Amino acid sequence: MELVLKDAQSALTVSETTFGRDFNEALVHQVVVAYAAGARQGTRAQKTRAEVTGSGKKPWRQKGTGRARSGSIKSPIWRSGGVTFAARPQDHSQKVNKKMYRGALKSILSELVRQDRLIVVEKFSVEAPKTKLLAQKLKDMALEDVLIITGELDENLFLAARNLHKVDVRDATGIDPVSLIAFDKVVMTADAVKQVEEMLA
């Protein structure tokens, strides 16, 4: 199959297995959920009644005071007491096979092509690391919410995009399923397309 280059009167021949396969919604969902789960810190921790600082002495005698019986100031019922089912640090990551991960990326890229959300260009750059230059370039292309993928990370482009809210710049090795579906449009250079094809082959 061929992808038309927007900034040139030509087309780029690409593999149909990478850019023309059927959309596997279940696979994409599984991989995206796993990717998001892997980004969780999982560092939350609370103290049980055994870990809270405080005396082990019984606050008052069992009977005769008229107050409710109590055996410890560290009881979860008490203010500043321990937590009954205390949270523990945990690893939320889920295992995803390479074949599944690549399959999900191919599905997403193919769907982007079908929905006309993937724009392929010969090259994409700015002369200087200026947000104004990139903003004007995107305005000329009628792009606002966009992920730009280049063959190699262009420092000028990267710095120019940092202050734009709905714009991100990645090199071909930095793509992931979440970022591909997070933006309205994806702009890829011809070099990036070839690199992605080789990565997913």
Swiss-Prot record:
Entries under SUPFAM superfamilies matching the protein: Ribosomal protein L4 (SSF52166)
The GO terms this record gives for MF are: DNA binding; endoribonuclease inhibitor activity; mRNA 5'-UTR binding; RNA-binding transcription regulator activity; rRNA binding; structural constituent of ribosome; translation repressor activity
Q: Which InterPro entries does the annotation name?
A: Ribosomal_uL4 (IPR002136), Ribosomal_uL4-like (IPR013005), Ribosomal_uL4_dom_sf (IPR023574)
> Annotated region Disordered: where?
44-71
Segments passing through the bilayer: none
Does the keyword section mention Transcription regulation?
A: yes
What biological process terms from GO does the record include? cytoplasmic translation; DNA-templated transcription termination; negative regulation of cytoplasmic translation; negative regulation of DNA-templated transcription; negative regulation of translation; response to antibiotic; ribosome assembly; transcriptional attenuation
Highest taxon of source: Bacteria
Question: Quick one: effect of changing residue 167 to D?
Answer: Does not regulate the S10 operon in vivo
Coiled-coil regions listed: none
Q: Which UniProt keywords apply?
A: Antibiotic resistance, Repressor, Ribonucleoprotein, Ribosomal protein, RNA-binding, rRNA-binding, Transcription, Transcription regulation, Transcription termination, Translation regulation
Instruction: Give a yes or no for keyword rRNA-binding in this entry.
Output: yes
Query: What the protein does?
Result: One of the primary rRNA binding proteins, this protein initially binds near the 5'-end of the 23S rRNA. It is important during the early stages of 50S assembly. It makes multiple contacts with different domains of the 23S rRNA in the assembled 50S subunit and ribosome. Protein uL4 is a both a transcriptional repressor and a translational repressor protein; these two functions are independent of each other. It regulates transcription of the S10 operon (to which uL4 belongs) by causing premature termination of transcription within the S10 leader; termination absolutely requires the NusA protein. uL4 controls the translation of the S10 operon by binding to its mRNA. The regions of uL4 that control regulation (residues 131-210) are different from those required for ribosome assembly (residues 89-103).
Q: Which family does this protein fall into? A: Belongs to the universal ribosomal protein uL4 family.
Q: How does it assemble?
A: Part of the 50S ribosomal subunit. In TnaC-stalled ribosomes forms part of the binding pocket for L-Trp with the leader peptide and uL22.
Q: NCBIfam families, from UniProt? A: rplD_bact
What does the record's miscellaneous section state? The erythromycin sensitive allele is dominant over the resistant allele.
What the entry lists under PANTHER family is as follows: 50S RIBOSOMAL PROTEIN L4 (PTHR10746), LARGE RIBOSOMAL SUBUNIT PROTEIN UL4M (PTHR10746:SF6)
Output this protein's name. Large ribosomal subunit protein uL4
- In its UniProt entry, the species of origin is given as Escherichia coli (strain K12)
